[in-house]
Amino acid sequence: MPKLKTKSGVKKRFKLTASGKVKHGVAGKRHRLISHNAKYIRQNRGTEVISDADAKVIKKWAPYGLN
């Protein structure tokens, strides 16, 4: 049986934590930030953990894990 391929978009956008949770970067930080206040920009910095339901789908698209 051939190897399963990982979705390239998943490789680029998600990381797996040691406990098995899936992290992703917060959306809406590329351009047009002048219209947002400093609190919005600060709070959307970094990454967040996605929900369990979404994580299940992401893990299916990455059959050998995300490194």
From Swiss-Prot:
What GO CC terms are in its UniProt record? cytosolic large ribosomal subunit
GO terms under biological process: translation
| Signal peptide annotation | none
Which GO molecular function entries does the Swiss-Prot or TrEMBL record give? structural constituent of ribosome
Please give the Pfam families that the UniProt record associates with this protein. Ribosomal_L35p
Q: Which UniProt keywords apply?
A: Ribonucleoprotein, Ribosomal protein
Entry's SUPFAM superfamilies? Answer: L35p-like
Give the family from UniProt.
Answer: Belongs to the bacterial ribosomal protein bL35 family.
Listed name of the protein: Large ribosomal subunit protein bL35
Query: Per the UniProt entry, what species is this protein from, by scientific name?
Result: Novosphingobium aromaticivorans (strain ATCC 700278 / DSM 12444 / CCUG 56034 / CIP 105152 / NBRC 16084 / F199)
